[in-house]
Amino acid sequence: MEPSWLQELMAHPFLLLILLCMSLLLFQVIRLYQRRRWTIRAMHLFPAPPAHWFYGHKESYPVKEFEVYPELMEKYPCAVPLWVGPFTMFFNIHDPDYVKILLKRQDPKSAVSHKILESWVGRGLVTLDGSKWKKHRQIVKPGFNISILKIFITMMSKSVRMMLNKWEEHIAQNSRLELFQHVSLMTLDSIMKCAFSHQGSIQLDSTLDSYLKAVFNLSKISNQRMNNFLHHNDLVFKFSSQGQIFSKFNQELHQFTEKVIQDRKESLKDKLKQDTTQKRRQDFLDILLSAKSENTKDFSEADLQAEVKTFMFAGHDTTTTAISWIFYCLAKYPEHQQRC
């Protein structure tokens, strides 16, 4: 009796392994193809510029995004779907009413963008969802009590006044002023004083220059990675030149946040410093450390690191962008500036 094809295959493990790999590859291709078809059907009502079947809109997006976006917004005033590679599509919304509708929905967070952000910020409030997000939100909630926030106003106003004084000195020598870096220092100065009880002023010294440089480069590389579909794969990105640079700055960011946490832990061990800490109000970091000591199961060291990174980065970067954008709009539309 001749052996069956299955018996022959079992007798050659290498061929069996090849068959298994090919089957898994075929399954993945079919899954991605079905996802592409579903996305096309879901977005068919929204007009979009022609896209290459493999590269998507890579020819014009995002290399020249500041040149392309105004044109896209004029041509597609409500929203436009843009493909990044053959299987990933980003839905760019331009109309505020569309944004309202989207924010009212309970859709899951973007898998691609949050995976990339999570690779250096960690699993904090920005990237979490579900029950763990609710637990973390409950932990940090006391730090946003209105009575505590009122105390911060004085600290923030001092940081703003310091920035304005620097502007007056600069304008006396040069009529042009690049705002973003100054605003970034001011917001980080405010957050470090209010949330982490940082002594001194970041705007006057260069103690956090390495942190700011790391955040800037990590944000830049993350944005570039998001728009390169090949780099969506962790393994491909890790061994790319950008991945190596990303790893270097990510390590610097981790070391900085780790130092902030360890310094506070050491101060709590020191009896004299502990008395000083207890006399002042509890800040954001105190609340996180307290939560970790009370419940190590639901709030680990990694969770602590993630929330510190999230609050430092998301807190100062988003605020900086918003304030800079407001300044730009006020300068572009002086009639509204007069009304303010």
Curated annotation (Swiss-Prot):
Gene3D superfamilies: Cytochrome P450. It is a single-pass type II membrane protein. The keyword Phosphoprotein does not apply. GO terms for molecular function: heme binding; iron ion binding; monooxygenase activity; oxidoreductase activity, acting on paired donors, with incorporation or reduction of molecular oxygen. SUPFAM superfamilies: Cytochrome P450. It is found in: Membrane. Detected at low levels in mammary gland and mammary carcinoma. The chain crosses the membrane at residues 10-30. It holds the Pfam family p450. Its cofactor is heme. One of its GO terms (cellular component) is membrane. The keyword Transmembrane applies. Residues 31-340 are lumenal. Keywords: Membrane, Signal-anchor, Transmembrane, Transmembrane helix. Belongs to the cytochrome P450 family. This is Putative inactive cytochrome P450 family member 4Z2. It comes from Homo sapiens. The lineage of its organism: Eukaryota, Metazoa, Chordata, Craniata, Vertebrata.
